[in-house]
Amino acid sequence: MLLPQLKQAQKRGVPIRILTGNYLGITQPSALYLLRSELGDQIDLRFYADSHRSFHPKAYFFHADKESRVFIGSSNISRSALTSGIEWNYCLSSVVDKQAFDQFYASFEDLFYNKSVEITDTVLKKYAKSWVRPAVAKDLARYEKQSEEEKQSGLKQEYQPRGVQIEALYELEKSRKEGAEKGIVHAATGIGKTYLSAFDSLPYKRVLFVAHREEILRQAAEAFHNVRPDDSYGFFTGDKKNADVDLLFASVASLGKEEVLKRKFSPDSFEYIVMDECHHSTADQYQKILDFFHPAYLLGLTATPERMDGRSVYELYDFEVPYEITLKEAVNRGVLVPFHYYGIMDDTVDYSALHFVRGHYEESELTAAYLENTKRDQLILGYFRKYHPKHALGFCCSRQHASHMAKFFSESGVAAGAVYSREDNTENEGDEKAYWLDRIEAVKKLESGEIQVLFCVDMFNEGVDIPVVDLVMFLRPTESPIIFLQQLGRGLRKAPGKEYLTVLDFAGNYRQANLAPYLLSGETANFHASTADVALTLPYPQDCIVDFDLKLIDLFRKMEEGKRKGHDAVVHEYHRVKELLQHVPTRVELFTHMDEAVYQYCLKEAKENPFRHYVMFRSALGDLEKEKCAWIGTDAVDFMELIEQTSMQKSYKMPVLSAFCEADGGSVNGLKMAVTESDVLRSWKKFYQTGTNWKDVNKCKTKADFENMTDKDHLQNITKNPVNFLKQSGKGFFVDKKGYLIALKDEMQAVLQEGGMKFADEVKDIVQYRVLEYYWKRYRDKA
């Protein structure tokens, strides 16, 4: 409301200073982000910083040529306080009472310069991450909403970024100014990521939005059209191929084919591309799209937890995560409703008797265990009736399971339906088929109250908004943290009259059942380090209830006793990844798929870290190929372990080592014995021109600083740091050689010849892993 006037004052050269407090969390981070975004460095924005005294004044100072005024009173900077609320304010003029004015102004000056801290990007980000919406904010929001509704009555709706969207837009623009060409927004369901991408796309003419379901594309098209009403838009799905539009909404299935991409588009067809649910980006069809197009900016959107289900997607986006807000933070900030979670012991199924293959229980065995289980059906129905929801979702393991539950509930007097893909429905037989509903029809009936519960199979995990859902039931093992949080997120959106979401989790003795407390609290990194009792005292989001059956707590304790720790946990995780991939994993593959808690343990315990001696680790497990066993005790293993263990305060050594791995002239079975200045310079510049990697280079505070560096500057950096340190490391593997910048010692010639391409592949794998490890750590520390 005040922003237009502040911007006008700024244009006139008026200095603007604001001193605010973080007392009781009344100051909203998004408001501060908006000020910084719109007014930039021309506003001096500060926090009161005396923790021993409360800060509660409201005063507004205005200075003119001949007079200054201060308004003192009860109005803070909020719509209701400045318009419709009952507030008392007093205006004091320096002309009328100079002594009193000077006293107030001197007090402000003292507070501003002596008892405050500047709100830098770092300070603001830290405040936003820890901010919890105060209880009084609910009343304030009600007043604001009423005032806004009165103002907007009869007016056309305006679409403007709100709340955390403002924060995300600020961070996205900041990252682009730093040179980023890609980025992931990792945000819990409910913040409006699609609208966020629409706002962020405004500076770009042609936009591509990619998703895996047509329903998501329709919702996205509506959002973009609301934000960009003058732009043409169309779809690239099924029989719709409207490629020549400003805003194109395309399904992965229709777009992710090489022949289609080459026939219909060029690599620069779009300036801005959005990949919805970007955790799918590693799939083949997504990869084809990413490989083909070269936009000015690529934005990935996801609500999933990055630390538990693989990291490869982050590599595709240069480990750039400009903005993230976890589910816990979103609930704390009032973006999502709180949840009342009930962990219910389901001992009607013995999961230990079922086969667990490649990270999942066999679907057919799960289905069989559920279909003829009257005791379980009654247990689920009993708890459902206890909490009497109006709009519920039940997540099932298969189409047969979903149909069975819909039939059982319907016959028990609860209007129910089943939702799964049409392909599955064609195979369904018997009268249970009668309970199947088309996805769109099902949502309408659930929203209207015509049916009370929908039982679904992988249909509502992501990308579908049904805000009215007030109860979700987990009716199958949720082995994947991604799936667990996606299912939870289906019911956390705010809706009129909805105060919280009820969650019924029917848990049994299945693998990782004891992960639930960590996922609900956001403390997943502590999974392998904590005890069962600690897990039950974790800090959950504000106003949330988490209640586990006593029998379930006993189960968690038993699982804790059997939980693998230390070396056993690392070995078990290695075998899990090997089973998942169906081959011995490379270092990069193990890093990509390793459980984050196990990985953190490896980083803390160097002796247990397989990445520091991966050949010997595999040898100890009997997983090393016969020809590679001959490397043990030779320079081959010593050289690899040197690269695996070399310290990396910065990333300087990696582009130098990458120069040895480049497949051009002079290599011996894929590796060079020596590299020239031009070899290293080419590798170095390519590496640091990627994304925001330039930040590592000495004396570079901005992307422009890096771009202005000469080859001489780069070579000075290269020679002084990585080349010098490599020559001093290990058993003298790196040496001087006439005509080259750096070389391998002569004895390595035999190693390269005898080791062949397999040795070269191991070395390249190490270098790639060390790069990924470095940037993952940088992202994690920043987060």
Regions found by a protein language model. Give the residues of each.
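PLD/PLD-like phosphodiesterase catalytic module centered on the HKD motif
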Residues: 1-162, 166, 170
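Long, largely alpha-helical accessory region at the distal end of helicase-like NTP-driven motors
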Residues: 130-161, 172, 366, 376-386, ...
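Walker A/P-loop
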Residues: 177-200
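Conserved strand-helix element at the start of the C-terminal RecA-like helicase core
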Residues: 207-210, 214-216, 368-410
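Conserved helicase ATPase core of P-loop NTP-dependent helicases/translocases
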Residues: 218, 235-236, 241-242, 260, ...
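Post-DEXD/H (motif II) to motif III coupling segment of the RecA-like Helicase ATP-binding lobe
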Residues: 280-341
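Conserved interdomain linker/interface between the two RecA-like ATPase lobes of SF2 helicase motors
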Residues: 323-393
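Conserved segment of the helicase C-terminal RecA-like domain
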Residues: 481-483, 490-524
